[in-house]
Amino acid sequence: MSLSAAEADLAGKSWAPVFANKDANGDAFLVALFEKFPDSANFFADFKGKSVADIKASPKLRDVSSRIFTRLNEFVNNAADAGKMSAMLSQFAKEHVGFGVGSAQFENVRSMFPGFVASVAAPPAGADAAWTKLFGLIIDALKAAGK
């Protein structure tokens, strides 16, 4: 339940410029997710039933996006450590199943995240596959937890 050291390095190198401006990039990613998958907003108590325009104007956007990007940063920083990843994925899956969030929602994220990363800065060759694998681990953990 981890990435290889080389995969983790690729994810980390492509993630660094994104996380360097985590506030703006986190907001932009969340808005892009809601624009592409409008039902995704309904999984967030602060955004349920709101339009993308209302979400963009919400003071809660930064709080939510910051929590998401901080958590994702933890996954990236520990991606090659099977023991840590196993524990983190298990905890993450339990939390998200409790919110009603399952593998389908993270399939949506996985489908667009490498492109989002590339929109911030050109990733190294192979980074897309590393991100696909990382989100695959999250999806597998959610499936194992029943979602």
UniProtKB/Swiss-Prot annotation:
Binding site for heme b: 96
Family: Belongs to the globin family.
GO molecular function, one term: oxygen carrier activity
Annotated ranges, domain Globin: 2-147
Alphabetized InterPro entries for the sequence: Erythrocruorin (IPR002336), Globin (IPR000971), Globin-like_sf (IPR009050), Globin/Proto (IPR012292), Globin_lamprey/hagfish (IPR013314), Mb-like_M (IPR044399)
Full protein name: Globin
Subunit description: Monomer.
